[in-house]
């Protein structure tokens, strides 16, 4: 295979991608990476139109094509409309990346029904119905990528039962969905990041560290880097590149799998 042929299999020219929760952080990096590979991108947001438009503007400035569409994926009716509107605008949809999510910490004894429902509504139920609508709207040979977490795989994390449970369910989803989606040759996979340095990173990361509330942001970075033998923390681009691979022809034989993106971290 020539270098040109190898490059072409990583490209997404002519494809249309939808990324939920892509106004910032990991989602923004995924949307940008898919656009850099040639895809037109639907940048979804729930509550931050300015942030989403910033992502769209950056993609367009770099020669790409993108639009911002609002939808709260905890509301199935909004999810349905999101996919309908995406197809109405671009005429097709080939890639769906479910990135929307919320974090939650709390000892088992303190978890309320409201908190349980809030987290599952987005992280689990929301992702399920994003995948359902993706199956209905995607072209033959499309890609569905769901968002898991190292906490769905790693040893137990204190005060993290609800969040970890929402992510553990996603791993089972993709194994079963991959079979259901086979009739349209759609692959379904899960990316499971470890700690990724986004705007929420330091506040969340302190919850994983004993006495973390007493550490400065610099000390948090130093501590978190030791979780990986590569001695650094994860960046949004680390997740985005894997999503780009899965979305491309290069990833067409990866199906029903959970890909850990954690630098071999052991928390």
UniProtKB/Swiss-Prot annotation:
Principal EC category: oxidoreductase
Record-annotated active site: 149, 163, 167
Pfam families found in the cross-reference section: adh_short_C2
Top-level lineage group: Eukaryota
Induction notes from the record: Expression is positively regulated by the cluster-specific transcription factor TSF1. Expression is induced by the presence of the cluster-specific polyketide synthase PKS1. Expression is up-regulated during nitrogen starvation.
Enzyme Commission (EC) number: 1.1.1.-
UniProt record similarity statement: Belongs to the short-chain dehydrogenases/reductases (SDR) family.
The protein's name in its UniProt record: Elsinochrome reductase 1
Species: Elsinoe fawcettii (Citrus scab fungus)
